[in-house]
């Protein structure tokens, strides 16, 4: 396994561990989730380019679209929780009702 792929996989694992360790605040969870998506994007792009998968060139772009949607929904939840309760704890998400 090349060192670049190893570093990207380690970045994904680090972001996953950050997601598991710092799960009390919504902002830190969103940052770790963005780190995971960024490392998945880079790894999928490098894999497609190195293996010459011509039919899969749109997969990293699709992954970026889902990452942008996830970020928008996450920031909307962060603003809603912050305006309602003044804190960004994840446990406050259980109190939100439509």
Curated annotation (Swiss-Prot):
Transmembrane portions of the chain: 2-22, 29-49, 61-81
Domain of life: Eukaryota
EC class name: translocase
Catalysed reactions listed for this entry: a ubiquinone + NADH + 5 H(+)(in) = a ubiquinol + NAD(+) + 4 H(+)(out)
UniProt-annotated location(s): Mitochondrion inner membrane
E.C. number: 7.1.1.2
GO BP terms, alphabetized: ATP synthesis coupled electron transport
A GO CC term assigned to this protein in UniProt: mitochondrial inner membrane
GO molecular function list: NADH dehydrogenase (ubiquinone) activity
Entry-linked InterPro entries: NADH_UbQ_OxRdtase_chain4L/K (IPR001133), NUOK/Mnh_C1-like (IPR039428)
Alphabetical UniProt keywords: Electron transport, Membrane, Mitochondrion, Mitochondrion inner membrane, NAD, Respiratory chain, Translocase, Transmembrane, Transmembrane helix, Transport, Ubiquinone
Pfam family, one: Oxidored_q2
Topology of this chain in the membrane: Multi-pass membrane protein
Main location: mitochondrion
Subunit structure of this chain's protein: Core subunit of respiratory chain NADH dehydrogenase (Complex I) which is composed of 45 different subunits.
Family to which this protein belongs: Belongs to the complex I subunit 4L family.
Function: Core subunit of the mitochondrial membrane respiratory chain NADH dehydrogenase (Complex I) which catalyzes electron transfer from NADH through the respiratory chain, using ubiquinone as an electron acceptor. Part of the enzyme membrane arm which is embedded in the lipid bilayer and involved in proton translocation.
Name listed for the protein in its UniProt record: NADH-ubiquinone oxidoreductase chain 4L
Species of origin: Prolemur simus
Gene: MT-ND4L
């Amino acid at each position: 396994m090349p060192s670049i792929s190893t570093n990207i996989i380690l970045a994904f694992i680090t972001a996953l561990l950050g997601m598991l360790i710092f799960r009390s605040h919504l902002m830190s969870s969103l940052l770790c989730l963005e780190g995971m998506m960024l490392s998945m994007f880079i790894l999928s792009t490098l894999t497609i380019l190195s293996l010459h998968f011509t039919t899969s060139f749109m997969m990293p772009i699709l992954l970026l679209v889902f990452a942008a949607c996830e970020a928008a929904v996450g920031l909307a939840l962060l603003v809603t929780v912050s305006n309602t309760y003044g804190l960004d704890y994840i446990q406050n998400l259980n109190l939100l009702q439509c």
